[in-house]
């Protein structure tokens, strides 16, 4: 696994983590989003369909897992297809790019966890079909990933807002703005000042 010095460095340099450890080549917009996770508590990304945002989300999960002790990373999306077939598969793909990482991070159909720490060092996939999808998570380091956020009901966001009252919690939302109201829409409109916002095309 990474040395203590490397962990301290990469915790503040997610772009370099993605390049050095995952052997990926983020485009300029993806780099800005990754850096926003260090510099801002809440990041919201408007994007079209495509793998570009799924890659950023997957990189973010793996980066946070490897550079923060005992994190919890709840991930959600409106449908099982978006969550498991796309995002979760993307996480599996990128972690395999580093043999050491691949052996230390254990991937299952619904969970990614640090070897030997399944209950306290993990990312977990929960579909946004029930109000309690994102409830019950407590840790010093939290990263919420909400994919296709425009299709996620506002009540799902309520526990996220509660968690974001603590300094170690962060939020990354991505989605195609298909709704003209709601939590995600507001993050690019009336609540825009509270967020670091981006607009990218869906592309590889």
PLM region descriptions:
Residues 1-204:
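Phosphate/NTP-binding elements of NTP-utilizing enzymes
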């Amino acid at each position: 696994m990474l040395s203590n010095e490397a962990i301290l460095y990469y915790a503040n340099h997610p772009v370099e983590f993605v390049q050095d450890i995952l052997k990926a080549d983020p485009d300029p917009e993806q780099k800005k989003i990754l850096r926003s996770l260090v510099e801002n508590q809440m990041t919201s990304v408007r994007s079209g369909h495509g793998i570009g945002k799924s890659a950023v989300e997957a990189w973010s999960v793996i980066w946070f897992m490897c550079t923060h002790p005992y994190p919890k990373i709840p991930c959600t999306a409106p449908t099982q297809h978006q969550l498991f077939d796309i995002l979760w598969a993307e996480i599996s793909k990128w972690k395999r790019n580093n043999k050491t990482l691949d052996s230390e991070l254990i991937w299952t159909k619904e969970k990614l966890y640090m070897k030997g720490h399944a209950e306290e060092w993990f990312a977990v996939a929960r579909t946004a079909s029930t109000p309690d999808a994102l409830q019950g998570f407590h840790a010093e380091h939290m990263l919420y990933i909400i994919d296709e956020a425009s299709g996620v009901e506002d009540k799902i966001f309520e526990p996220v807002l509660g968690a974001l009252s603590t300094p170690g919690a962060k939020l990354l939302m991505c989605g195609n703005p298909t709704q003209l109201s709601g939590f995600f829409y507001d993050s690019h409109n009336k609540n825009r000042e509270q967020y670091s916002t981006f607009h990218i095309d869906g592309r590889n």
